[in-house]
């Protein structure tokens, strides 16, 4: 019964998501799963071969690039519930095959979209939870009613690491990451370093 409930919950989430995006004027689209370039995210792709064209192709890691083409082509609001594939590790945050929703809304700035997504989560939770915005997990009761607390990326890292990022060199960041036992790759740029440190400390 528990597994059956999970399938039902997933179906409800998809229906409610479509309702929310459609009523806001979004167009749902399908973009190619087989792609000639593995783009849209920094991730290891699955590689396959197209026999008729005799070329290697990739299962998409994200729908981003095709959705952005639609924005450039004049579609101001697009979204996709995309099946994506990443040939990486498996843990509580990673699965090689997964569904994600990706959406673009032209001419809207990030603070508007943050508030709009808060309303989406509130709508979603109410829809699956008999009108209640509160959900109990193993430890806490989480209330999805907005507004949500805002956390500034730089301020949060400055506080967690007890440094000023504006005055911290890339080499110093690498040293901090190594001290934290992060498996630092020499190809990592400053952005990747900051992202990994954020995941570890914030």
Residue positions per predicted region:
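Generic recognition of short, well-ordered alpha-helical interface segments
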Residues: 12, 112-115, 151, 168
């Amino acid at each position: 019964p528990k597994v059956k409930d999970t399938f039902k919950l997933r179906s409800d989430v998809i229906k409610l998501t479509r309702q929310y995006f459609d009523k806001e004027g979004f167009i749902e689209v399908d973009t190619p799963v087989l792609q000639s370039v593995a783009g849209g995210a920094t991730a290891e792709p699955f590689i396959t071969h197209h026999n008729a064209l005799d070329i290697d192709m990739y299962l998409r890691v994200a729908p981003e690039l095709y959705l952005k083409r639609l924005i450039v082509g004049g579609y101001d609001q697009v979204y996709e519930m995309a099946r994506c594939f990443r040939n990486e590790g498996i843990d509580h945050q990673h699965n090689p095959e997964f569904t994600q929703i990706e959406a673009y809304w032209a001419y809207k700035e990030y603070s508007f979209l943050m508030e709009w997504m808060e309303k989406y989560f509130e709508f979603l939770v109410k829809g699956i939870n008999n009108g209640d915005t509160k959900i109990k997990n193993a430890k806490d009761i989480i209330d999805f009613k907005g507004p949500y607390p805002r956390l500034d990326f730089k301020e949060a890292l400055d506080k967690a690491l007890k440094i000023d990022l504006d005055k911290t060199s890339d080499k110093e960041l690498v040293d901090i990451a190594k001290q934290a036992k992060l498996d630092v790759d020499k190809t990592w740029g400053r952005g990747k370093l900051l992202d990994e440190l954020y995941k570890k400390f914030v």
